[in-house]
Amino acid sequence: MRRKGTKPSTACHQEEGPPPSQDGAHSDEEMEQPAGEAESAAPAKPPGEELDNRSLEEILNSIPPPPPPAMASEAGAPRLMITHIVNQNFKSYAGEKVLGPFHKRFSCIIGPNGSGKSNVIDSMLFVFGYRAQKIRSKKLSVLIHNSDEHKDIQSCTVEVHFQKIIDKEGDDYEVLPNSNFYVSRTAYRDSTSVYHISGKKKTFKDVGNLLRSHGIDLDHNRFLILQGEVEQIAMMKPKGQTEHDEGMLEYLEDIIGCGRLNEPIKVLCRRVEILNEHRGEKLNRVKMVEKEKDALEGEKNIAIEFLTLENEMFKKKNHICQYYIYDLQNRIAEITTQKEKIHEDTKEITEKSNVLSNEMKAKNSAVKDVEKKLNKVTKFIEQNKEKFTQLDLEDVQVREKLKHATSKAKKLEKQLQKDKEKVEELKSVPAKSKTVINETTTRNNSLEKEREKEEKKLKEVMDSLKQETQGLQKEKEIQEKELMGFNKSVNEARSKMEVAQSELDIYLSRHNTAVSQLSKAKEALITASETLKERKAAIKDINTKLPQTQQELKEKEKELQKLTQEEINLKSLVHDLFQKVEEAKSSLAMNRSRGKVLDAIIQEKKSGRIPGIYGRLGDLGAIDEKYDIAISSCCHALDYIVVDSIDTAQECVNFLKKHNIGIATFIGLDKMTVWAKKMSKIQTPENTPRLFDLVKVKNEEIRQAFYFALRDTLVANNLDQATRVAYQRDRRWRVVTLQGQIIEQSGTMSGGGSKVMRGRMGSSVIDEISVEEVNKMESQLERHSKQAMQIQEQKVQHEEAVVKLRHSERDMRNTLEKFAASIQGLSEQEEYLCVQIKELEANVLTTAPDRKQQKLLEENVSVFKKEYDAVAEKAGKVEAEIKRLHNTIIDINNRKLKAQQNKLDTINKQLDECASAITKAQVAIKTADRNLKKAQDSVCRTEKEIKDTEKEINDLKTELKNIEDKAEEVINNTKTAETSLPEIQKEHRNLLQELKVIQENEHALQKDALSIKLKLEQIDGHISEHNSKIKYWQKEISKIKLHPVEDNPVETVAVLSQEELEAIKNPESITNEIALLEAQCREMKPNLGAIAEYKKKEDLYLQRVAELDKITSERDNFRQAYEDLRKQRLNEFMAGFYVITNKLKENYQMLTLGGDAELELVDSLDPFSEGIMFSVRPPKKSWKKIFNLSGGEKTLSSLALVFALHHYKPTPLYFMDEIDAALDFKNVSIVAFYIYEQTKNAQFIIISLRNNMFEISDRLIGIYKTYNSTKSVAVNPKQIASKGLC
């Protein structure tokens, strides 16, 4: 059953609307209105209701370029194809059904009526965004499958799968990598729908953009022909009847792409109409102002006549006043002649006197300024030196004090440490001594017991040897008993002697300390005295050597200054010579490379055989490197040779011919004078520089030759600027760019490219120079360079000597100042030590021991020592005897008795040490308290002295830092001032010398000037009288002001020449003429305001004319742009139209086997006025309009047009629903064969019930319906036929 459809050209079927909601869904009512219908619903605005105020450039720039073809028509180009369609619960398809796969070229869908064939097309329309009504449904929810077996389904989905392929032979093809994608649309029960691209949620706009980018024509729906619509394509009206209606003209315009120009053409047309209206208004204003201006012209002329008369009268007054002044000046001249005779001989003296006076004033002022400056700097240096000397003295004093205080602090620290250790030691003496006594007593008792044991052991040993040593042993025992008595006496005597000695040492300790301090003080006094003596001698030596060093330093500095100046002069000379040598070498190199013709001509010039030769034109001038390429590209005459005249040029030509050297072109300067007037500056577009003005020459005569070569060629930065500048309305210019591109006055363009010309003209003018001259310059450069090196070496030696002398001088000064400052400190130290020695000597006397007490203690020590010595001597004798006996016994007993005896000796020795330790401990306990009190007093005194000394050290360090900072500042200031002092002193001496010379000259001139003064005073009185009269007449002339007349510039009061003044013989006649003119002026009564009013109207008239010209120019620009766009639209349309109509004719002839069809213009002069008519001549019939054809003929005509449009603008996909319904068997076969054979770069999916259509297809998609659900099956007819299955 066929469906009623609408023609695809009247509306677009895709969705457009507001953005989707958050869930991405669209409602059927809100979102599925076609864009074309939305446009038709909006009322058209009248052209004058809203004016487009964009500039012409903005309007033209807003025009998009012609749309590119969506896909290529040539073989092997990538194209889009549908692989298969997946329907899920869509219309008659229950569940998920896959339709396909479709063939890459020709697929037919077949099946019985009502099986769901057209639902295949509907599924694609659904995905492509068509409204529900276009898919034969009232709303989207109706598209969801509903049958007895499948109820309450909530949604339906259709997926169309695409891929891009490259065709190969036969049915084979290559799939482009990553080109597969699918577009799906899902509709819900609430009539909303969502789109997905390859599973990702998208808007319909994204889907539309994607499909358009792959060549699917969603805008004109050429890919889709539904039931009954095939003939409606050809039946469109020639042109749309309304603005939003679409006929054949609009249909073709959209396909060709020139429709994009319609809106800009309308805008420009409206702007031209409005500008014409405005221009009419401006023209009327000009005429009105011109009429008012003409009405004021009579009064204006009368006023001008009056002003002219007054000007004539003022001129006459000017003449008579000048005559009177001239007469007085002649009288003054006579007197002046007398005056000149008087002081003619003294004129030079007066001038010299004035000059000397001015010089004297200037020099006196300069001397005062320099003296002030010099005094200020000198005073500043002296003040700083005094400050530094004082600071250095303070520094030495503080350092000496700091040194003494630091030394004192170190000694006190050591003393304090010793005193503290002594206090701690004395504090622990009683306890330690008691502990020692207890421990020693215990140890002594233990040793006594041990000795008894060892003696018993020894006795046992000796008993064993008794028989052998019995006699000796008895004798030894007797001696030992005697020794035991002696040992007790010895220990007691030794203890008494050591106690007495300790008491004597403690009693004499303070006195011994005082004696030690006195000895050290005397040694320090000797050291200070020797240092003072050495420094006084050093000061005397420095005072002798310092002046000699200073004198030597001055001489070296003078020599260094002289060498420095010589070095500067020589370096400057060497630098200049180096530049000259480099320029000479460059010039020589360029001269060598200029060619044999130019070399021969230049050689003739140098030899003098052909005078008047200047040289190659390019070598006679220079230009900035920026313009090198420009002038090298556009000026062919740079290689011409410049000569003074045509005769010289002829001589050069004859010379070249005679010697067969070559040919050359010459410029004769005597023929170039015709260009002199045109060489002046000119006004150029955009102030573009003229190349001629950029050329620099040494000889101004050559400029005419350069103008001849360049004329008014301009140089632009780039080709865009060059194009703007070259094509001016009133004149065309010759322009060259910095890249060498040239635009001639004729409009032709040349130059540019990858290789450009450069180097034909240098950045400096080249002089002729020989190899000998270059060698001479190089020799001179080498000589001066060696001399500069020698002076530099001498300078370095002098600089080193000056540095050494300055160091030596500075060291002497510092040493002198330090020694001078330290002498006082050493003297004070010497005095201090003397006082200290006296104090220490008094202290020695104070601490001197009592002689009686000392003698008593010494006598005690002596008595105890004698007692000890006497007892010890006796004990020693007994002990020696015991030892002898013991040794004898030992010798007898050999080694048996020796070990035991050694043990016993060791114990005896330890017992002696214990006795001595107990004695010392007892003495220490007795003297500990007294010594502790003295030691604690000493610690307190030392700590107080340390605090005072530390405070003194910190104060001295702070003072020393302040002194150093001040000294550094003073030194820096002094150095800065001393650096500027020599220059100021030199300037002062020079000024004084110059001033002395001027004073001597001035005194000589004053004597001569005095005698002349008296004579001149008499003459000056007469001249003054005449001058006062001249001033009066000059004042009268200054009052004379001429009136400006019309637009002429105001005339200045003429100054008569001497000849004109002498020609005035009768001044009274001029006076009479002035009186006559005054009478005429009094009779006239003009309106002088008429001139200003006329001028005002004239300015307004010119302003109105300028406005008229401006709007006329703007109107012309818009009108020209309007005409250009109309022409462009026509050209684009006709180019596409001829391609389409020719292909239409070819297709129709093929489809009908002899018929003819064409698209013809209703109005051959203007295709856009009446539109396009589709005319057809079926085979063996006459030409007919499309409306008069049969159904089959209309179908064939429409298909021919569809295929012609495909040829012009290919579309990858075509869907056709029973396009062969109205065709007979023969025509169906022709159409099917045409689709199969001719259209190989597109995919056709056709629904057909005609066997001669679907039998020829590459793939059949069978549609059948069972159990209220549509199914499909795909087969390849050719494969089935090849297997013999049909």
Curated annotation (Swiss-Prot):
Residues bearing PTM Phosphoserine: S21, S27, S40, S141, S980
GO terms assigned for molecular function: ATP binding; ATP hydrolysis activity; chromatin binding; single-stranded DNA binding
Keywords for the protein's UniProt record, in alphabetical order: Acetylation, ATP-binding, Cell cycle, Cell division, Chromosome, Coiled coil, Cytoplasm, DNA condensation, Mitosis, Nucleotide-binding, Nucleus, Phosphoprotein
Binding site for ATP: G111, P112, N113, G114, S115, G116, K117, S118
Major place of residence: nucleus
Residue ranges of the region described as Disordered: 1-51
GO cellular component annotations of the record: chromosome, centromeric region; condensed nuclear chromosome; condensin complex; cytosol; nuclear speck; nucleus
SMART domains per UniProt: SMC_hinge
Signal peptide range: none
Coiled coil: 270-589, 768-1018, 1068-1133
Localization annotation: Nucleus; Cytoplasm; Chromosome
GO BP term, example: positive regulation of chromosome separation
Residues in SMC hinge domain copies: 611-725
List of residues that carry N6-acetyllysine: K379, K677
InterPro entries: P-loop_NTPase, RecF/RecN/SMC_N, SMC, SMC_hinge, SMC_hinge_sf
Superkingdom, taxonomy of origin: Eukaryota
Homology family: Belongs to the SMC family. SMC4 subfamily.
Domains as described in the record: The SMC hinge domain, which separates the large intramolecular coiled coil regions, allows the heterodimerization with SMC2, forming a V-shaped heterodimer.
Assembly: Forms a heterodimer with SMC2. Component of the condensin complex, which contains the SMC2 and SMC4 heterodimer, and three non SMC subunits that probably regulate the complex: BRRN1/CAPH, CNAP1/CAPD2 and CAPG.
Function of the protein: Central component of the condensin complex, a complex required for conversion of interphase chromatin into mitotic-like condense chromosomes. The condensin complex probably introduces positive supercoils into relaxed DNA in the presence of type I topoisomerases and converts nicked DNA into positive knotted forms in the presence of type II topoisomerases.
Name this protein carries in UniProt: Structural maintenance of chromosomes protein 4
Species this protein is from: Mus musculus
